[in-house]
Amino acid sequence: MAEFPASLLILNGKSTDNLPLREAIMLLREEGMTIHVRVTWEKGDAARYVEEARKLGVATVIAGGGDGTINEVSTALIQCEGDDIPALGILPLGTANDFATSVRIPEALDKALKLAIAGDAIAIDMAQVNKQTCFINMATGGFGTRITTETPEKLKAALGGVSYIIHGLMRMDTLQPDRCEIRGENFHWQGDALVIGIGNGRQAGGGQQLCPNALINDGLLQLRIFTGDEILPALVSTLKSDEDNPNIIEGASSWFDIQAPHEITFNLDGEPLSGQNFHIEILPAALRCRLPPDCPLLR
């Protein structure tokens, strides 16, 4: 195999006993690739490992985990200053892997690793909330956020993305819409939202296409609001074709402002953020990511 620059894999601590991954890394090392491995234990580890990666001079930092791990690693990368900032590689090892799935990262570990190390590095956007928290995939609000936040880990491990739907059905009696006002470029809406999706990527919640037209390098955020009087039809509508659905409001903008009379919660790549005021803006070409040539989220 041709020579490739060194990489550093930041592995979510939950995946340390993954024997096939260990074997795949050993095989690539035997082929001459330099792959450093670091394991996260607590929040902040990824940022420290990215600093170490820069000192090692690696070309790629690989996020090994789910959407939360990808978020933490990509956030640390965009905060780097100077030249020679490593590209982001993705090794999907989480429950839902929404971002990795939507950009067509291979499911096979060996293929995903090779792409993360040797794939083309393409500039992609990220999004920032209130000038602080970032997300690479999607911000979701409404009852969907509460479902994904509260779904038990054992249920997610057993059933994957379907677990969110099952838990949502179990919680329907306590889920209410969120009243809010949303503004963007040439966009204004106010009312009761059952689900809010603001996407740099397209899917969340274990495979639900909340923002099916989103692209990760167009400098825009895609917005979708699901409205209606009943929770169950809205939940079901995310599973089927929604063409000409009167309960769906759509918009696109480089920024959105959300105001609510009460505290609401957004889920940012799996991390909850609560408040009454949110300013969400796109950060164009914020980092480079190694993606497959058939990635459908590129313009």
From Swiss-Prot:
Q: Which residues bind ATP?
A: 40, 66-72, 95
Task: Give its E.C. classification number.
Answer: 2.7.1.-
InterPro entries attached to this UniProt entry: ATP-NAD_kinase_N, Diacylglycerol/lipid_kinase, Diacylglycerol_kinase_cat_dom, Lip_kinase_YegS, Lipid_Phosphate_FormReg, NAD/diacylglycerol_kinase_sf, YegS/DAGK_C
Q: Which biological process terms from the Gene Ontology are attached to this UniProt entry?
A: phospholipid biosynthetic process
Record's keyword terms, sorted:
ATP-binding, Cytoplasm, Kinase, Lipid biosynthesis, Lipid metabolism, Magnesium, Metal-binding, Nucleotide-binding, Phospholipid biosynthesis, Phospholipid metabolism, Transferase
Q: What is its main location?
A: cytoplasm
Q: Say which enzyme class the record assigns.
A: transferase
The record's HAMAP family line, in alphabetical order, gives:
YegS
Q: Which family does it belong to?
A: Belongs to the diacylglycerol/lipid kinase family. YegS lipid kinase subfamily.
The name this protein carries in UniProt is Probable lipid kinase YegS
**Organism annotation:** Escherichia coli O17:K52:H18 (strain UMN026 / ExPEC)
Lineage, uppermost ranks = Bacteria, Pseudomonadati, Pseudomonadota, Gammaproteobacteria, Enterobacterales
Gene behind this protein: yegS
